[in-house]
Amino acid sequence: MCQYVHREKNKMNEQADLNLLDPEAIPPDHQSGFVALIGRPNVGKSTLMNTLLGTKVAIVSPRPQTTRNRILGIMTKPQFQIIFMDTPGIHRPKHPLGEYMVNAAQHAIPDADALLFMVDVSVEPTPEDRDIAQLIIQGSPDAPVLLVLNKMDRLKPEQVKAHCQAYWNLGGSEKWYDSWMMTSATLGENLDELLEQIVATLPQGPRYYPGDQITDQTERQIAAELIREQVLRYTRQEVPHSVAVVVNEFKARSETLNYVSANIFVERTSQKGIIIGKQGKMLKKIGAAARPNIERLTGTKVYLELWVKVSEDWRRNEQQLRHLGFR
């Protein structure tokens, strides 16, 4: 099964869906564009995209470097279509997987019609923040830059002036961004205002994707990520970063039941034991937590089978990276 994910339909939005799917209903002044979410790991890029879309397209966790691929999230309204490009956090890579992730983020910059540079305003700028600001200035000089000061809910009152000023000055003496907004993606603070700023930057253009499509990810790809999300949730230390998930089979057994089989790859035998757990309890816990999310994705019951396999040092092995879909 290789099916792109679309918005759920109900009686309330049925007519709206029909209008969004009708090419004749697109107004002549329709706006559209690709908007890249850029920033270091764990600043809230995926959370922001999910919240703006009103649905979960990208997995989230407190762990840095959760996002490994560029993921599109598509917002379609009668007057505009925004294609958000959620990207891996830009960091200083230590292995080929990290290089792949950073390249995926960097390649999104010149492709974007607008850039959301996201930072964690509750802490002072890091060297990575400064590097990313320069990367944006040099890599996309013509695209509007919106500086998103996220995690405002964690910002202490006495920090506001100093932290904001430090981020405003990241690009040097000259103003390097077009507008800024303080937000809390988790609480939904100021997101309507941010969306207005994003739409204001968009050029007039066509509807690039069908009006009911919300992502470029297939059900199989999202299911793999939903399983990995639970591994991130329940494991500790180096194990979460050493895991990759591949869905081997995604098959409808009836109109109300899908069968999903997936391999969880780790780098060492000791990690395999941790994920399986005593008497298989950890693996059962991961499966039990992932299954309801996959059922919400498919709208059916899901029979989920998980297998744990060792692919030694796969993050440093180019051939294994390709096998796991990272090349």
Where in this protein do the model-derived segments appear?
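P-loop NTP-binding site
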Residues: E219-R327
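Conserved G1/Walker A P-loop phosphate-binding module
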Residues: N13-N103, H107-I109
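Conserved, well-folded catalytic cores of nucleic-acid-processing
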Residues: T55, I74, P78, P93, ...
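Conserved C-terminal guanine-recognition region of P-loop GTPase G domains, centered on the G4
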Residues: Q79, N103-D178, K251-S254
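Canonical P-loop GTPase G-domain recognition
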Residues: A143-P144, D153-T215
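Conserved glycine(s) of the Walker
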Residues: G44, N190, M282
